[in-house]
């Protein structure tokens, strides 16, 4: 008996919409990352992108536990000397609410070309409106 290996051209990808309102950030991000990788499918193959498309709405209403709302910091470097920039969760959720979920999910995906391809299938929106109605996304309860 041979092991089944999925081929990129035969993979069937579905569209799902996830409502992030009131959901804990980390628990939501792990489920989204798993769906983007395709680990929920029986034909999952590690070196093939078998995941689905995920549309996340209400990113501005995602929840965090404890004191993370004020204490959690996001860091990035500009590339210049002394260019370490930091922003708190509270300020980032006001400024760019999509980036909070995008950063959490991106850190849970593989690093490299395959991980970047998986990340491109994630669409995050701050409010309830999204422009993917033509794809007829199914509601995914997480």
UniProtKB/Swiss-Prot annotation:
Has the keyword Nuclease been applied to this entry?
Answer: no
InterPro entries in the record: Ribosomal_uL13, Ribosomal_uL13_bac-type, Ribosomal_uL13_CS, Ribosomal_uL13_sf
State the signal peptide span. Answer: none
Does the keyword field hold Ribonucleoprotein?
yes
Q: One GO molecular-function annotation for this sequence?
A: structural constituent of ribosome
* The entry's keywords: Ribonucleoprotein, Ribosomal protein
Q: Which residues cross the membrane?
A: none
Q: Which domain of life is it from?
A: Bacteria
List this protein's GO terms for biological process.
negative regulation of translation; translation
Q: Name a single GO cellular component.
A: cytosolic large ribosomal subunit
Task: Report the PANTHER family cross-referenced here.
Answer: LARGE RIBOSOMAL SUBUNIT PROTEIN UL13M, RIBOSOMAL PROTEIN L13
How it assembles, according to the record, is: Part of the 50S ribosomal subunit.
Role according to the record: This protein is one of the early assembly proteins of the 50S ribosomal subunit, although it is not seen to bind rRNA by itself. It is important during the early stages of 50S assembly.
Provide the family line. Answer: Belongs to the universal ribosomal protein uL13 family.
List the protein's name. Answer: Large ribosomal subunit protein uL13
Source organism (scientific name) = Photobacterium profundum (strain SS9)
Query: Which gene holds the coding sequence for this protein?
Result: rplM
